[in-house]
Amino acid sequence: MEGLKVTPLRGVYEEYGGKIVDFAGYELPTQFKGFLHEHHTVREKAGLFDVSHMGEAMVTGKDAGKFIQYLMTNDINVLKDNEVLYTFMCNEDGGVIDDLLVYKFAEDEFFLVINASNKDKDVKWIMDHKGDFDVEIADVSDSIAQLALQGPLAEEILQKIVDVDLQEIKFFKLRRDVLVDGKKCLVSRTGYTGEDGFEIYCKPEDAKGLWHAILNAGKEEGAQPIGLGARDTLRFEASLLLYGNEMDETITPLEVGMGFFVKLKVEEDFIGKDALIKQKAEGVTRKLVGFELIDKGIPRHGYEVIKDGKVIGHVTTGYKSPTLNKAIGLALVEEQYSKIGTEFNIKVRKKELKAVAIDKRFYTKKTKTK
């Protein structure tokens, strides 16, 4: 695939039967043994993902915390060292520039993990808003590889090849300088599947060795490599949002039900705060809802949502859920049609299929916090 970027793991995909596609300008595996098999493997055992296409940036300096707070909707002040926070970075209108993870290493040292498709845009946005803040900003994406081991057996498997007690790394906490198969890594208890799991950040030259070491450690437990197809169905069932589907620069966090991550009462100003305060006071005019198709069919991204002959929104993500065995989806619709139990139609290939609004938390699994 000419002109596409590759991750440090590009050479190992074919060893495991990987089928390669263009994703966010990268050659990445969409599946290995089939996305249904891979989906169930993560729900029941554990799966290993190459997520080295994600972007990373370091923000350091005396004003690092203040600067991060100015960029983000969540309350950065609550973060202690070695903790992780999910947040949005918005424009002045409250539209989402990106959703990302903020890792706090120290008062003057923060690590940002950003979506692959937004890497260049995000780094430019951050640099453009530096102003008089005493900070240094560095795009470190090319010097880091990232693996994700996800599933109920993730801890058991990874514990075999690390030098720390993984039970000490709680949900949304991190540990630096963990030896994973003898290689220094950053390990956080985070993920994008709705399961327990870890994200492992390493040097690019260590990625292949760690990939093999983790899969070998999980052989008995049935660990498998997982592609992008299952990554999307897993995050979707857990109602984890995808930039470009559920969010973009014209959609606010409040419209997609993510107000918990928008702290309007923080003392400090942040970009988009005024617009979001106004939107909260006036009420949103559209909302993200879950739905189930009553008629037979599969909803897909972009399909129209119709009520009484009028288009009231669109499907943001839709699948036949591998776990629930139902055709379900997420849709951004006019607020008055967002109540659970509301019936509407989804236009699937020129046919209008009946659907009903349901709780968008399709799948929940208790994350280990012990």
From Swiss-Prot:
GO biological process assignments: glycine decarboxylation via glycine cleavage system
Catalysis performed (reactions): N(6)-[(R)-S(8)-aminomethyldihydrolipoyl]-L-lysyl-[protein] + (6S)-5,6,7,8-tetrahydrofolate = N(6)-[(R)-dihydrolipoyl]-L-lysyl-[protein] + (6R)-5,10-methylene-5,6,7,8-tetrahydrofolate + NH4(+)
EC number per UniProt: 2.1.2.10
Gene Ontology MF terms in the entry: aminomethyltransferase activity; transaminase activity
Any GO CC annotation of this UniProt entry: glycine cleavage complex
Sorted UniProt keywords: Aminotransferase, Transferase
Family: Belongs to the GcvT family.
NCBIfam families in the cross-refs: gcvT, PRK00389.1
Binding partners and assembly: The glycine cleavage system is composed of four proteins: P, T, L and H.
HAMAP family tied to this protein: GcvT (MF_00259)
PANTHER family: AMINOMETHYLTRANSFERASE, AMINOMETHYLTRANSFERASE, MITOCHONDRIAL
Protein's job: The glycine cleavage system catalyzes the degradation of glycine.
Protein's name in the database: Aminomethyltransferase
Organism of origin: Clostridium botulinum (strain Loch Maree / Type A3)
Gene label: gcvT
